[in-house]
């Protein structure tokens, strides 16, 4: 079936360089509102049309071409968090370059490692970022040139273009030149370049929950196959509801979400800052009918359910595509909407594959939901099986490794082809999660393979229960202790001490665990999508075990 559909749909591609132009071709007046001005052009304000954003994409593409960027060349983007990350990525893709999106949350040494894997890319950043830790880790030959979106090179950071002088025999490689893109303002407009559908067109990185992130190489064809089922699901609200996206601009999901609603002609609201104190008034003013953010951000947005102005009252559909959501959070989101029949649509996926399974919830079904059930594999796009350690398919109801076959898979891990190949078994991709299928074919996600703790069937299920039983929890995760025992780590909504008696009652019927550890929420190690880095947290727990002050068993 997959081979047949691949032949039928061959030649289709998803090109982020054409996002705003394609939307403008349908209706150039469709509004797009930002929560913050563009960093490189704050004078333009926060209200645009898709036609104006297409013009901005053309302007930035012309600047990149004038600076020397050419088709198939890699452009690493690592800068202050702002929607202009997306615009510069679209601009690079517009001229056929390959944007490599690096999260602003990554530490400079990790960025240096990823730049080395990118093998001498152009580096697009801003002067403030360059003058910070990034400038101290850049090796002379680690990048082809530095392209500044704003500001000028800080004195002593890196020399300006042409300031290095003639090379002499035996000299070390000269530092990379620094180019201000603003110096190429008004450069001639360039025609679009569309790479082959199976050619690398975008590079993103994995969450990095287990260490240095992997660089995922995407192609237009796989992106197109990811987008099709999402456009089908969003069809009922096409052109009607204002769609609000608040997620990292360095994940492929953002561009899929953008394309999904731009192609439908929906007005859009794009936010950088997820803080409830700021996103609440924004939603109360703009009244989105669709919102999507990271699962952990939704937990913070539970505070919006009772916020002044009822910021979630107009939401018809809540969307989530990164990880399984806590039932408590879904219930509170749906309860905060004043629409007649609001829905929470949840997809389970990963960077390497995109959405793999999905389902939706109403207020009634959410009240009795099982947080580990992530729905049915997407028919026609995803084939999913559960296998044992030897790769043998397991019957329904048995727990094993999840593997998928699809047309949505990335091409490789850049610089780690062998690591990529090790996850393929006769065309089946080892997802890295443990789960099972029930009698109806529904997928139940139990744990990441690397996060399994002893004989505990599912640490995620325990976390769901604790979040539902203790409304004061903002975060709870289970990690292995020094002796392999489950250690619960929590953070509370207001950083108040966890009540030992309430914890005891909430855990009385759960598997035996070590004493609970309470952290400040901001001290928990996280990824760019706000997921907890469990291996790092486990190392932290084990390293400070001797000074632990537990709350209770």
From Swiss-Prot:
Name listed for the protein in its UniProt record: 3-amino-2-hydroxy-4-methoxybenzoate diazotase
One Gene Ontology MF term: ATP binding
Keyword Ligase: yes
Enzyme Commission designation: 6.7.1.1
Reactions it catalyzes: 3-amino-2-hydroxy-4-methoxybenzoate + nitrite + ATP = cremeomycin + AMP + diphosphate + H2O
Family as reported in the entry's similarity comment: Belongs to the ATP-dependent AMP-binding enzyme family.
UniProt keyword list: Antibiotic biosynthesis, ATP-binding, Ligase, Nucleotide-binding
EC category: ligase
Compositionally biased spans, kind Low complexity: 157-167
Chain residue ranges for the region called Disordered: 157-178
InterPro entries (UniProt xref): AMP-binding_CS (IPR020845), AMP-dep_synth/lig_dom (IPR000873), ANL_N_sf (IPR042099), ATP-dep_AMP-bd_enzyme (IPR050237)
UniProt keyword annotation of Ligase present: yes
Pathway note: Antibiotic biosynthesis
Any GO BP annotation: antibiotic biosynthetic process
Gene: creM
General function of this protein: Part of a gene cluster involved in the biosynthesis of cremeomycin, a light-sensitive o-diazoquinone with antibacterial and antiproliferative effects. Catalyzes the last step of cremeomycin biosynthesis, the diazotization of 3-amino-2-hydroxy-4-methoxybenzoate (3,2,4-AHMBA) with nitrite to generate cremeomycin.
Pfam families linked: AMP-binding (PF00501)
Species for this entry: Streptomyces cremeus
């Amino acid at each position: 079936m997959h081979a047949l559909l691949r032949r039928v749909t061959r030649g289709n591609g998803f090109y982020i360089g054409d996002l705003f132009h394609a939307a403008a071709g349908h209706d150039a007046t469709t509004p797009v509102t930002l929560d913050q001005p563009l960093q490189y052009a704050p004078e333009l304000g926060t209200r645009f049309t898709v036609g104006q954003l297409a013009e901005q994409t053309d302007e930035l593409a012309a600047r990149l071409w004038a600076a020397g960027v050419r088709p198939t060349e890699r452009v690493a983007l690592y800068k202050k968090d702002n929607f202009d990350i997306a615009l510069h990525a679209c601009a690079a893709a517009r001229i056929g370059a390959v944007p490599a999106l690096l999260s602003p949350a990554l530490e400079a040494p990790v960025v240096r490692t990823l730049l080395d894997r990118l093998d001498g890319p152009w580096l697009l950043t801003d002067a403030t970022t360059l003058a910070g830790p990034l400038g101290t880790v850049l090796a002379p030959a680690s990048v082809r040139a530095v392209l500044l979106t704003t500001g000028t090179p800080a004195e002593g950071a890196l020399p300006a273009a042409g300031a290095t002088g003639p090379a002499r025999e035996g000299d070390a490689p000269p530092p990379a030149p620094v180019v201000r893109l603003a110096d190429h303002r008004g450069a001639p407009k360039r025609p679009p370049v569309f790479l082959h559908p199976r050619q690398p067109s975008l590079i993103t990185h994995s969450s990095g929950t287990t260490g240095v992130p992997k660089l995922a190489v995407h192609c237009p064809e796989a992106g197109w196959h990811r987008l099709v089922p999402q456009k089908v699901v969003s069809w009922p609200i096409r052109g009607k509801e204002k769609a609000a996206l608040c997620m990292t601009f360095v994940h492929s999901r953002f561009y899929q979400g953008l394309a999904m609603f731009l192609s439908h002609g929906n007005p859009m609201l794009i936010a950088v800052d997820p803080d409830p104190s700021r996103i609440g008034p924004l939603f109360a003013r703009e009244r989105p009918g669709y919102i999507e953010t990271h699962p952990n951000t939704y937990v913070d947005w539970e505070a919006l359910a009772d916020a002044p102005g009822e910021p979630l009252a107009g939401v018809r559909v809540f969307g989530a595509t990164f990880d399984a959501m806590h039932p408590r959070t879904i219930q509170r989101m749906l309860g905060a909407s004043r629409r007649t029949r609001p829905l929470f649509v949840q997809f389970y996926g990963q960077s390497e594959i995109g959405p793999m399974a999905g389902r939706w919830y109403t207020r009634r079904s959410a009240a009795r939901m099982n947080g580990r059930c992530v729905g049915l594999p997407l028919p026609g796009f995803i084939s999913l099986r559960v296998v044992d350690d030897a790769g043998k398919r397991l019957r329904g109801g048995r727990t094993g490794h999840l593997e998928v076959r699809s047309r949505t898979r990335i091409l490789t891990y850049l610089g780690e082809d062998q690591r990529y190949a090790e996850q393929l078994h006769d065309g089946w991709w080892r997802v890295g999660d443990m789960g099972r299928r029930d009698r109806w074919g529904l997928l139940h996600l139990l744990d990441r393979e690397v996060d399994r703790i002893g004989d505990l069937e599912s640490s995620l299920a325990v976390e769901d229960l604790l979040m539902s039983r203790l409304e004061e929890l903002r975060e709870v995760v289970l990690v292995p202790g020094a002796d392999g025992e489950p250690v619960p780590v929590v953070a509370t909504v207001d950083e108040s001490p966890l009540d030992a008696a309430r914890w005891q009652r909430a855990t009385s019927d759960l598997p035996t665990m070590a004493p609970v550890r309470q952290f400040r929420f901001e001290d928990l190690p996280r990824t760019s999508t706000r997921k907890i880095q469990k291996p790092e947290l486990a190392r932290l727990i084990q390293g400070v075990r001797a000074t632990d002050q537990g709350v209770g068993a």
